[in-house]
Amino acid sequence: MRGATHAKWVACAVTVALAASACGDDGDSGGSGDGAGIVRSSWGDPQSPVEPANTNEVQGGKVLDMIFRGLVRYDPETGEAQNMIAEDFETTDSQKFTVTLKDGWTFSNGEKVTAESFVDAWNYGAHIDNNQKNAPFFSNIKGYEDVHPASGEAKAETMSGLVVKDDLSFTVELTDKFSLWPDTLGYQAFSPLPQAFFDDHDAWLSKPVGNGPYTIESYTKGSEMKLRAWDGYEGPDKAQNGGVDLKVYTDNNTAYTDLIAGNLDLVDDVPAQQLRNVESDLGDRYINQPALIIQTLVFPMYDEKWSADGMEKVRRGLSMAINRDVITKEIFQETRTPAVDWTSPALGEKGGYKDICGDACKFDPDEAKKLIEEGGGLPGGKVTISSNVDTGSHRVWMDAVCNSINNALGGGTCTVNPIGTFADFRNQIGAEKFTGPFRAGWQADYPLIQNFLQPLYYTGASSNDGKFSSKEFDDLVDKANQETDPGTAIESFQQAEEILAEQMPAIPLWYQNGSAGYSENLSDVSLNQFSVPVYDQIKVN
């Protein structure tokens, strides 16, 4: 998915524009010793209003993860797919599945969670008229092409592969065999929706109603979102606190300063500038652990200047002009690891992690120059790197990457294009505004190698922002998805990855650890494998 997120009077003076979120008494953690206080956490405004099939970035995903529960949920420690609302998945051929639900689940408005709640939600998410970003996640369900054709109008209102049997069961027919399909259903696009969503969509978007451990109390764009524990939640992961106030910051250094000042309880992205001091500042309240996150630079393959024949040499050459070892050591203080493929070491070798990029991900200025010259040179003789700079210390590494490229290829070759906010950055990506490589931080939707490859590089995929297209790559992904043996499937996915190494539609930069820091007000703070705080388990002291 789609990214990454003192005296009191001093902090207030610094953050006067954020006074409502950083300095007011409203939202005080107010712990009473029973863990039921409010957690004050840093956050960034999502690109769009949060809804399951239309949110594919990290900030909105954090909210969905608190207010929804789906068929499957990933264990916060291991990433293992575990049934949540699903009682069972039955199949004899890995293509036709019968899904049985547990009884007793409800939405926070009192509506029951039924088979229809899932089928209606998935049909809505898939239909072309609804313009949902995550529609391609439903593309392997039979009938998808009728509700979401490659061109023209829909031929049907619903997918033929989805059939409600009764309140607690429905059947799913896929277009091809996909043995791991149930394991993908922990992604938030597959969440159920109440009838209220369809009765008054605008009202629902203004205050989403879900079936998770939290409800949304209020949201002020640019300031904060208040979520409160739902007393009626009967799931196994009931909130251990009274709620979470997600406070908007456009600079994570400011968030860190507020944490140290006692005006904030949790930051889930420690800025690079603070890494040298974070252990002395926070001690054992600093978390640094591997996560299912990779940072890349995506080429705008929609621009023929970058996608023309021979330009793969230029793209590979730029990759070899980046000194990942120095950047990760000097800037990120061991919270990043130089990338050697397009997945994550958190998958492990059994999960498909392997050095596939090879020499193309190693710093070699001479070879970089040679390849770029052989490929016809950089378009216009220069390259501009774009990224949002409101979170994640992005401006610091952008400058470092450009300095590396300039040192390797000659001064003035590389410049940076900092974008003020994540929302604006994503909007410009969607409008295909960039004429040079742009940052893509991918946080896996589920812990499978497939999720690092298909959503990002498959033709027409939901997060294929650079519009890369390769029939050979697509065919290998299709082949992998149809394998019933996981080991054989992984081999096919790795063969598809080799196409990425040849074509370099995106430069792998580094794997990102999950990092967080928290105040003395909190306990039981942890990050899941996706580097997102396990908010429902946090206690306020």
Residue ranges of predicted features:
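Ligand/substrate-recognition segments at binding pockets and active sites
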Residues: 347, 371-444, 486
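Surface-exposed binding/hinge segments that line
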Residues: 90, 100, 117, 126-194
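Ligand-site clamp/hinge motif
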Residues: 199-202, 231-277, 292
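Extracytoplasmic/peripheral linker and loop segments enriched in polar/acidic and small residues
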Residues: 90, 163, 328, 411-427, ...
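N-terminal lobe/hinge region of extracytoplasmic solute-binding protein
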Residues: 42-93, 207-209
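Gly/Pro-rich hinge or "lid" segments in bacterial periplasmic/extracellular proteins
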Residues: 173-239, 243
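Long beta-strand-rich cores associated with HINT superfamily self-processing modules
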Residues: 516-541
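Structural transition elements
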Residues: 337-374, 390-396
